[in-house]
UniProtKB/Swiss-Prot annotation:
Glycosyltransferase involved in the maintenance of the outermost surface of the fungal cell wall. Likely functions in the synthesis of a currently unknown, potentially minor but widespread, extracellular or outer cell wall polysaccharide which plays a key role in facilitating many interactions between plants and fungi by enabling hyphal growth on solid matrices. Pfam families: Glyco_tranf_2_3 (PF13641). The chain crosses the membrane at residues 4-24, 305-325, 339-359, 368-388. It comes from Zymoseptoria tritici (strain CBS 115943 / IPO323). It comes from the Eukaryota. This is Type 2 glycosyltransferase. It is an enzyme of class 2 (transferase).
Length: 471
């Protein structure tokens, strides 16, 4: 058994390990400033192509996304859908602006395949991936393009918020709180060491040269998870690729760059959380234990965000803090113990569990009534997180109609054939072919840092593969 002094140091150690990141990130978030728009920008709207992968057949939400994107006057929007939806989306494109919107398709719905169908078609210097349920502000493009004045900048994201409905409820508040915390974490970590957990696919801009690189395409279409090919988690892969290839990532946390979106305002939100949790487990485990460069290139982000996937369990931590304080204060006076427990209670439930939402409460003071819901859901989320851990091989969407057919789930994660196997590769698609010949220099794991390869015309050594390259 620990002595009273031992319990005291156990309490102090747990407190520092859990809350050092909160204190430092508060300072970082409060002092963060977005990159300003230059007086004479190198990049403009005509340098931007928007790629919008979707399985929607149309509808007000998709139409609204297209219209708000067009207001920013990009060079082109490429809608990538499945063959069955081409007719409907072509009619929608003609209805909105047939000169600016192009419709492409693949046979089977899968976001990575749809993205790879469109990427070679891009002729502009910047490509922006957009989800089909977002609303862009009019001045988004100047803000999201500003960081690219730095030639080392490979990708840029923006702040995001949920559309606030006329009638609020607890589910909507949880939606809004999730995005608010995400903005807070990303801006804080980027300000310290340039890292962030993931560049969100809702809206993210990239240099087209990165996406059109053959090594990127090979890595993007051959990512694996254990013995399976992984076709989900596309935004996580691109984020890790940028960092592993020495590109910088930026985030424009500014009202004029704020993208609005919708999330499930009901029990389906739990399915969204489960999907995000699985993605976090898979990507953060790869970052820390497979790619590993994060430990020295973004040490703070690794401590503050990545490792919390493994270590941050709210209920056990909070219970241990109160218990260790109880054991450490057994010889204190009653008044001192009451004061210590009161301060700890206020610190945990008054400050640390709400500080990331201060901006939200400032905008909507009435939402303070949902603080108990927010705290309770934080504890419940531990169960979601645990279930995500034990079901990592599942890739169900859970919250979108038509997204979880047996065929779509098969495509998102498929078994790899054994090395040397002559069994036909179940990953093949009639409309999406994986590269059969790959330049030798490209046969690198997606996480290896290497210089961008020279033009393929300069290479004569090729290797023929029958199975995807993977560790």
């Amino acid at each position: 058994m620990l002595s009273i002094l031992g319990w005291f140091w156990a309490f102090v150690s747990a407190f520092v390990l859990r809350y050092l990141r909160t204190i430092v990130n508060c300072i970082s978030n409060w002092t963060y400033r977005p990159i300003p728009i230059p007086d004479n920008p190198t990049y403009g709207p005509q340098d931007v192509t928007i790629i919008l992968p979707t399985i929607a057949q149309g509808g007000e939400e998709l139409e609204g996304t297209l219209r708000t994107c067009l207001r920013t006057e990009p060079y082109e929007i490429i809608l990538v859908t499945i063959d069955a939806n081409v007719k409907n989306l072509t009619l929608l494109a003609k209805k909105i602006n047939s000169k600016k919107i192009r419709v492409l398709s693949v046979r089977e719905a899968n976001k990575r395949r749809q993205m790879c169908r469109a990427i070679p078609e891009v002729s502009t210097r910047i490509t922006i991936f957009v989800d089909d349920d977002v609303i862009w502000p009019v001045k988004l493009l100047p803000w999201i393009l500003a960081p690219f004045e730095n030639p080392q900048m490979g990708g840029v994201g923006t702040s995001q918020r949920r559309v606030r409905p006329e009638k609020m409820n607890a589910w909507v508040f949880l939606n809004m709180g999730y995005l608010e915390r995400r903005n807070w974490d990303c801006s804080a970590c980027l300000h310290i060491d340039g890292g962030l957990p993931c560049l969100s696919g809702r809206t993210a801009a990239y240099r087209t040269s990165i996406l059109q690189d053959d090594a990127f395409t090979h890595g993007f279409t051959n990512e694996t998870w254990r013995t399976m090919q992984l076709n989900a988690d596309d935004d996580n892969f691109i984020t890790r690729w940028l960092y592993s290839h020495n590109w910088k990532i930026g985030m424009q946390y500014h009202k004029e760059a704020e993208v609005l979106t919708t999330l499930e305002a009901g029990p389906k939100y739990l399915s969204q959380c489960l999907r995000w949790v699985r993605s976090n487990w898979r990507s953060n485990i790869k970052s820390m234990f497979v790619e590993r460069h994060y430990w020295y290139t973004q040490l703070w982000t690794t401590y503050s965000c990545l490792q919390t996937t493994i270590t941050a369990w709210a209920l056990p931590w909070d219970a241990f803090l109160f218990y260790s304080l109880h054991k450490a204060s057994t010889d204190w006076s009653d008044d001192s113990r009451k004061m210590a427990f009161t301060l700890l209670f206020l610190w945990i439930f008054g400050f640390t569990k709400n500080v990331k939402l201060w901006g939200h409460y400032f905008r909507y003071p009435v939402d303070v009534i949902y603080i108990p819901v927010h705290i309770a859901f934080g504890y419940f989320h531990g169960l979601i997180k645990f279930w995500g851990l034990v079901t990592l091989s599942e890739t169900t969407w859970g919250s979108r109609d038509g997204a979880d057919s047996s065929e779509l789930n098969r495509i998102r994660m498929m078994p790899l054939p054994p090395y040397g196997s002559t069994t036909p590769d179940g990953r093949k698609s009639e409309t999406f072919e994986y590269m059969q010949e790959m330049p030798l220099i490209d046969q690198l794991p997606a996480y290896d840092t290497h210089d961008r390869h020279p033009p393929l015309s300069n290479m004569t050594s090729t290797i023929t593969t029958t199975t995807p390259f993977h560790d």
